[in-house]
């Protein structure tokens, strides 16, 4: 693996919780995923969180969250959360010429949205793996199949790997889920990331700021990044295979982190649930400080 470049970003996240009434919640919490160090991909240079009165929470993947308690929020008021980061992201290029060795025993199990034990997915993984001399070629076959056969369509939901094989279309969540599921079906460890994509003139028309992508564990290389969504066209196919471009910023690992309860980036609970209406809105802004290595 080589590291030919690095990019730095200033990232602003803001969430607002507006109590539209008719009463105030007895209990209200929101858990916000925090960008963290994730070697060798990224390093957090600084982080500022407001308001300060939050609790740090960790999950089974090592993801970190700020838990805020806004119980008793008065009707007609808005609570605002602001988080500012400076993050350095590495460009990584992997040499897959040597693909012999052992694999890991974890990140190979089926789970919600990663249906690697589904008969249709198992059969497809076996078919695509035929006559491939090693694990690296198998993963490339999965990657190429996804690019050639899935029809990209933003749907706003994660329908999982099995859903990606249907006629509804797929976006980054299904592209990633299918790559992970096909890999795990053949015993190849694979992980699912949710994060942010810095959009430039090349990616703005083909992706969204909120993004998902995988990495896979390959012999002699370790964890190797790829992006089947951005690599779905033939002209971009090689650019995003075994190449971590430094426009990807990891927020969480895992398709179903327990703290998020099926959500992405943040989750919000208040009760009694019928006591009032609390509207949560949020946005991200990403500024490139010194974008290089592309």
How does the language model describe each region?
Residues 1-92:
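Intrinsically disordered, low-complexity N-terminal segments that are enriched in acidic
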């Amino acid at each position: 693996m080589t590291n030919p470049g690095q990019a730095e970003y200033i990232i602003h996240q803001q969430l607002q919780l507006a109590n539209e009434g008719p009463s105030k919640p007895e209990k209200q919490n929101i858990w916000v995923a925090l960008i963290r160090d994730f070697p060798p991909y990224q390093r957090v240079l600084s982080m500022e969180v407001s308001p300060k009165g939050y609790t740090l929470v960790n999950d089974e993947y090592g993801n970190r969250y700020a838990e805020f308690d806004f119980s008793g929020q008065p009707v007609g008021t808005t609570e605002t959360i602001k988080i500012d980061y400076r993050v350095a992201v590495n460009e990584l290029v992997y040499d897959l010429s040597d693909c012999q060795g052992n694999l890991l025993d974890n990140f190979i199990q089926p789970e919600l949205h990663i249906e690697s034990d589904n008969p249709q997915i198992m059969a497809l993984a076996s078919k695509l793996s035929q006559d491939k001399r090693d694990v690296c070629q198998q993963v490339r076959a999965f990657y190429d199949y996804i690019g050639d056969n899935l029809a990209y369509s933003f749907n706003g939901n994660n329908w999982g790997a099995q859903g990606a094989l249907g006629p509804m279309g797929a976006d980054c969540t299904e592209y990633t889920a299918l790559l992970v599921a096909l890999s795990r079906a053949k015993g190849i460890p694979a992980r699912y990331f949710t994060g942010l994509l810095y959009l430039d003139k090349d990616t703005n028309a083909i992706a969204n700021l909120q993004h998902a992508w995988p990495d896979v564990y390959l012999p002699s290389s370790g964890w190797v990044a790829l992006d089947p969504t951005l690599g779905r066209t033939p002209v971009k196919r090689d650019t995003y295979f075994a190449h971590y471009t430094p426009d990807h910023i990891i927020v969480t690992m895992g398709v179903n982190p327990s703290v998020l309860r099926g959500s992405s980036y943040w989750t919000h609970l208040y009760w009694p649930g019928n006591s009032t209406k609390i509207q949560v809105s949020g946005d991200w802004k990403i500024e490139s400080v010194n974008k290089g290595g592309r």
